[in-house]
Amino acid sequence: MRLWKSMAWGILLWHSQSGALCPAWPPARAAEEITRLQQQLADWNDIYWKQGVSAVDDSVYDQLSARLVQWQRCVGQDVSSTPVSPPLNGTTMHPVAHTGVRKLADRQVVEQWMRGRSELWVQPKVDGVAVTLVYQNGKLARAISRGNGLQGEDWTPKIRLIPSIPQSTQGALANAVLQGEIFLQREGHIQQRMGGMNARSKVAGMLMRQDNASALNSLGIFIWAWPDGPANMPERLSQLAKAGFSLTKKYSLVVKDASEVERARQSWLTSALPFVTDGVVIRMAKEPASQYWRPGQGDWLAAWKYPPVAQVAQVSAIQFSVGKSGKITVVASLVPVILDDKRVQRVNIGSVKRWEAWDIAPGDQILVSLAGQGIPRLDEVVWRSRERSKPVPPDSHFNSLTCFYASATCQEQFISRLIWLGSRSALGLDGMGEASWRALHQTHRFEHIFSWLTLTSAQIANTPGFAKGKSEQIWRQFNLARRQPFTRWIMAMDIPLTQAALQASGDRSWEQLLMRTEQHWRQLPATGERRAGRVIDWRNNLQIKALSRWLAAQHIPGFGS
């Protein structure tokens, strides 16, 4: 299937000074799109933190938040007002600020970050809700939500109802501040297979809803920071484990280089764990005194997240493809994203009717994942641009009996037919892909799908973009095609039969094929009444008859007298 293309149906992009890929919007539209997305994120954020429910998948929210920051940087706008952190509802001060964690993009950046740092450990990045636990005189005194990192809500009553969180401590932990992640306890959770399950939102919901004490039994705690705790990491982990925070010791590994981090990351991605994760955190054993901790300034730790199972991608254009059967398919061209090491630049939407139901236009943000065999799949539309500039689909008069001959309206189906006849299912013309067929047709203006048979070696060699070796290969392929058996040629003519049915029919010439009755076709494997009727229609089609006469004049096997 080939694509109808038009710049009028897409959006242009440009690179900002920061290197970000930016939509080439007029200033007014850029301001409007940024404001709309900012407001939508704020609304989702408000619902999430006030009602404990998620209106959108966690991963989608995170990616759209990053997209907003990108757009703001494109236009030189301050990003400090981006609503990606919880609204400040609580007024309880954290004894020690939550620093947050810097995200590292890939292994190369991880290597750069690790360079010059020593005594490094790696832990799973548990996906849940951050909390501060304050122990005084051996008792849990306060539990505070992360909030803005400096102050948050008092969650003490709810946290005291979670059985997995120790209510009393001894020794150095009798008077201590701990920071960690409240998570949804899982049995044998394999992240690669099971995904994130919106775990963060589920935990937030449990903590915010009233009268749900029994649900809190399913929550656990992973401590990732003990400010001003023992300087020796093994000692720190040992004391936490003795106090009932055993997961931290179990899932903390010494690492010396990025390879070891990568191995741990891959292992935790594919192994059964008791919690949902979204990456790993690398941290230095040596931390500054807690009085120096500030939100956004924790340079002693960094995260390397897992690649998302699905990516939010921006639609850059809508294109229509017409297959050899005349079926029109809609394809969305995308600003490229990486999924499982695969560069995804387009996704098949389906029929025109399905595209209209999806209501997708250039500028929209869609969620794309990989289906079987790595084929990009459209999952949902997560954000629609204000401007709805959509192309008009081509006329739907194409069918399985159109465009054997070239014309202005038949351009795409005609190219699809050339690609089909060159495939291994038909004539097997090695090296003849879409680009080669387009170049030949554009240069030599084919009359019909077999016009290439009359090209000379000189004509092929003079085709723009064809190197000497390639033109010689094509010349040989075209000559070898003349020796192909009759059944291969009628497959190239798109007879509506399977190869098995053709073999069972036993036809070796056009004359034999003309003598067959509809009853004969019905009796062939996988044929039946409907397909038999289509074979008769195909055989009686004027373009097919004209092609058979032309092939006879070219002395193609089975078509001559």
UniProtKB/Swiss-Prot annotation:
SMART domains: LIGANc. Keywords: DNA damage, DNA repair, DNA replication, Ligase, NAD. GO terms for biological process: DNA repair; DNA replication. InterPro entries: DNA_ligase_AS (IPR018239), DNA_ligase_B (IPR020923), DNA_ligase_CS (IPR033136), DNAligase_adenylation (IPR013839), DNAligase_N (IPR013840), NA-bd_OB-fold (IPR012340), NAD_dep_DNA_ligaseB (IPR050326), NAD_DNA_ligase_OB (IPR004150). Its EC number is 6.5.1.2. It catalyses: NAD(+) + (deoxyribonucleotide)n-3'-hydroxyl + 5'-phospho-(deoxyribonucleotide)m = (deoxyribonucleotide)n+m + AMP + beta-nicotinamide D-nucleotide. The active site is at residue 125. GO terms for molecular function: DNA ligase (NAD+) activity. It comes from the Bacteria. Belongs to the NAD-dependent DNA ligase family. LigB subfamily. Catalyzes the formation of phosphodiester linkages between 5'-phosphoryl and 3'-hydroxyl groups in double-stranded DNA using NAD as a coenzyme and as the energy source for the reaction. HAMAP family: DNA_ligase_B (MF_01587). This is DNA ligase B. It comes from Salmonella newport (strain SL254).
